[in-house]
Curated annotation (Swiss-Prot):
Keyword field contains Protein transport: yes
Protein name: Ras-related protein RABH1e
Residues covalently joined to lipid (S-geranylgeranyl cysteine): 205, 207
Keywords: ER-Golgi transport, Golgi apparatus, GTP-binding, Lipoprotein, Membrane, Methylation, Nucleotide-binding, Prenylation, Protein transport, Transport
UniProt motif Effector region: location: 38-46
Pfam families documented for this protein: Ras
Gene3D superfamilies: P-loop containing nucleotide triphosphate hydrolases (3.40.50.300)
Species this protein is from: Arabidopsis thaliana
Length: 207
């Protein structure tokens, strides 16, 4: 029987302007639900989830940061030891997309190239209000050399594929990352029994 490998832990920090849907993406991934009541994240929230892959298990530590300017000074310390930075914008809010350049630069300042960056265009369900095309998002990701995907936390669109992309890009996952993204290994999502306390403070983002 194969020996049991130690559980690898990876820190994912979610960044982006206020109200772009960072909390809602995490909530949809963790609990497969969407809360229509908007409640701004205060400071930093933490949750964790175990992902069961083909031949290993990883623990994802999800750090949800506040988008308000008054909390901006807290964020660099959370970026510093992160494995992944997930930078979210609202496809119906062009300014939030433009501001992702600063978020990417902040991550690179703190972590250099030693971090996986994922650019996420959220709220694709707002079709009639879209201000940022998928081509613009893809081009920006190519310019910065980061991963790109569009999602809708409200509709549950591309949430699992987002985390599959992240899992495939993690250190030690070379065999997974060599797989074509559209054929990536299926992930059995189960909530970790050691999820951080504080769930009761979590509010869904109206996205």
């Amino acid at each position: 029987m194969a020996s049991v490998s130690p559980l690898a832990k990876y820190k994912l920090v979610f960044l982006g302007d206020q109200s772009v849907g960072k909390t809602s993406i995490i909530t949809r991934f963790m609990y497969d639900k969407f809360d229509t009541t908007y409640q701004a994240t205060i400071g930093i929230d933490f949750l964790s989830k175990t992902m069961y892959l083909e031949d290993r298990t990883v623990r994802l530590q999800l750090w949800d940061t506040a988008g308000q300017e008054r909390f901006r000074s807290l964020i660099p310390s959370y970026i510093r030891d992160s494995s992944v930075a997930v930078i979210v914008y609202d496809v119906a809010n062009r300014q939030s997309f433009l501001n992702t350049s600063k978020w990417i630069e902040d991550v690179r300042t703190e972590r250099g190239s030693d971090v996986i960056i994922v650019l996420v265009g959220n709220k694709t369900d707002l079709v009639d209000k879209r201000q940022v095309s998928i081509e613009e998002g893809d081009n920006k990701a190519r310019d910065y050399g980061v991963i790109f995907i569009e999602t809708s936390a409200k509709a549950g669109f591309n949430i699992k594929p987002l985390f599959r992309k992240i899992a495939a890009a993690l250190p030690g996952m070379e065999t997974l990352s060599s797989t074509k993204q559209e054929d990536m290994v299926d992930v059995n999502l189960k909530t970790s029994s050691n999820s951080a306390q504080g769930e009761q403070q979590r509010g869904g983002c109206a996205c």
